[in-house]
Amino acid sequence: MSHQEGSTGGLPDLVTESLFSSPEEQSGVAAVTAASSDIEMAATEPSTGDGGDTRDGGFLNDASTENQNTDSESSSEDVELESMGEGLFGYPLVGEETEREEEEEEMEEEGEEEEQPRMCPRCGGTNHDQCLLDEDQALEEWISSETSALPRSRWQVLTALRQRQLGSSARFVYEACGARTFVQRFRLQYLLGSHAGSVSTIHFNQRGTRLASSGDDLRVIVWDWVRQKPVLNFESGHDINVIQAKFFPNCGDSTLAMCGHDGQVRVAELINASYCENTKRVAKHRGPAHELALEPDSPYKFLTSGEDAVVFTIDLRQDRPASKVVVTRENDKKVGLYTISMNPANIYQFAVGGHDQFVRIYDQRRIDKKENNGVLKKFTPHHLVYCDFPTNITCVVYSHDGTELLASYNDEDIYLFNSSLSDGAQYVKRYKGHRNNDTIKCVNFYGPRSEFVVSGSDCGHVFFWEKSSSQIIQFMEGDRGDIVNCLEPHPYLPVLATSGLDQHVRIWTPTAKTATELTGLKDVIKKNKQERDEDNLNYTDSFDNRMLRFFVRHLLQRAHQPGWRDHGAEFPDEEELDESSSTSDTSEEEGQDRVQCIPS
């Protein structure tokens, strides 16, 4: 047969023609090594030649010498050796040998992978155990720095008492309330309990003689907290839980402002704080209304904020009490609000916080929607400007003189800002150790000169920090196994009222014989930080969704408890939610918004 390229006959008869007819063929196993260089070439590229010179293999058997002169017109591309099977000629074919080698290599690689240390999900390194040790050590150092010993307090009890006896200290009570010595002696004095659900708001009147509380049961209770007795208990008129209830100043305790999860802003008219004449609606937000900000000396005016991003100013002397001040926006997008606080030194300025990381300060005289959405200045910790997960502010509050502003961040820390600094200024102090994740928690100043910072926590404790040093100086179990949300300092005595998810109001006084031992503080701080870091590492859900699920679960639990009354609470429908206005003009609708109080 002559040499010609491209001879492509049919599949050869494997019985009569030799697959290995080649000039280089050698008899015996010795030929295997000589032809090994041609094996892979035949398996991948078909080669043609005369006399069936198919350099597609060098494997020989005993019959190979008998077929050396056989004319074969088949080419290597006509035969696929991998389809032949291993037993046909007594030797494994190329494809199968390669597969076995690959399987052996894979098994070796798997063994090596099992021997390799597992990657640390936090740092990305290979030594996970060492990473955990380093993390624990760093955590211990951080906790020690937050609870380190403080220098001796400058205010001394015996010296102050002696000076008072001699008449040289006219401000003993004022100074005592701001003394670290008294704060470190706080202990639970007693419980006030008449509610049938969690208590979401507490507020002292201007003189400090009465305490108002309300919550899930939709009732407002006015307490003579010293005698531990309720003096007034009435229906609020809200459809869903009351979030805040506050006494107006300079009104003889005759007016109480309220807001709730149904978006309503209502006012209760009291008679000598012992009888409620009626409650009426004065404004309506399109979402929950979380907080009120009373004008310090006015018995008529206050501000409200809601999750509809609207701030209302309410003036009870007007026929239509509510007027819209501003709609909070960021890049033309509304920002729902959780909190509002009025500057006590400048009643035209107020601060708000909510669904993003910015504390916004407005001046009611200078709100220009075309310029920075009307914002006077904004503050936020610089590391939260471009954080990887959404951040929310649950509470903002001004200091006693309006020069400082506290902001508590959801699942973050508490930050102190200088309100007089320019727009975008960094925080001044940072307060750590608590946990603010499940509910909308309050933060507050404590002391006549705002010497301390106090906050509740998901762990059920009350934390006190010294404002100047950021050190934790007091740590109290405020709600066993539950959450502390509200903290209300007495206007002039060293007394603190707190409430949370249980049915009681707690009264704290500095009556402990010695300073409270911070027993278990390090373990609680460590647990709070680890849980927060774990949640941030596995962050998949928004704060609003978590809050909604939490409140629904909480209300369902309360509904099955003994003593829970059916108040006929209903969620507002879409048509009602579209209303964001003050009380209706018509007398008929006015009558519907007015609820006659029925004391219990």
Curated annotation (Swiss-Prot):
<keyword id="KW-0853">WD repeat</keyword>
<feature type="repeat" description="WD 3">
    <location>
        <begin position="284"/>
        <end position="324"/>
    </location>
</feature>
<protein>
    <recommendedName>
        <fullName>DDB1- and CUL4-associated factor 8-like protein 1</fullName>
    </recommendedName>
</protein>
<feature type="region of interest" description="Disordered">
    <location>
        <begin position="1"/>
        <end position="122"/>
    </location>
</feature>
<keyword id="KW-0677">Repeat</keyword>
<feature type="repeat" description="WD 6">
    <location>
        <begin position="435"/>
        <end position="475"/>
    </location>
</feature>
<comment type="similarity">
    <text>Belongs to the WD repeat DCAF8 family.</text>
</comment>
<feature type="repeat" description="WD 2">
    <location>
        <begin position="237"/>
        <end position="278"/>
    </location>
</feature>
<feature type="repeat" description="WD 5">
    <location>
        <begin position="388"/>
        <end position="427"/>
    </location>
</feature>
<dbReference type="InterPro" id="IPR015943">
    <property type="entry name" value="WD40/YVTN_repeat-like_dom_sf"/>
</dbReference>
<dbReference type="InterPro" id="IPR001680">
    <property type="entry name" value="WD40_rpt"/>
</dbReference>
<feature type="compositionally biased region" description="Acidic residues">
    <location>
        <begin position="74"/>
        <end position="83"/>
    </location>
</feature>
<feature type="region of interest" description="Disordered">
    <location>
        <begin position="562"/>
        <end position="600"/>
    </location>
</feature>
<feature type="repeat" description="WD 7">
    <location>
        <begin position="479"/>
        <end position="518"/>
    </location>
</feature>
<dbReference type="InterPro" id="IPR036322">
    <property type="entry name" value="WD40_repeat_dom_sf"/>
</dbReference>
<feature type="repeat" description="WD 1">
    <location>
        <begin position="194"/>
        <end position="233"/>
    </location>
</feature>
<feature type="repeat" description="WD 4">
    <location>
        <begin position="332"/>
        <end position="372"/>
    </location>
</feature>
<dbReference type="Pfam" id="PF00400">
    <property type="entry name" value="WD40"/>
</dbReference>
<dbReference type="InterPro" id="IPR045151">
    <property type="entry name" value="DCAF8"/>
</dbReference>
<feature type="compositionally biased region" description="Acidic residues">
    <location>
        <begin position="96"/>
        <end position="115"/>
    </location>
</feature>
<dbReference type="GO" id="GO:0080008">
    <property type="term" value="C:Cul4-RING E3 ubiquitin ligase complex"/>
</dbReference>
<dbReference type="GO" id="GO:0005737">
    <property type="term" value="C:cytoplasm"/>
</dbReference>
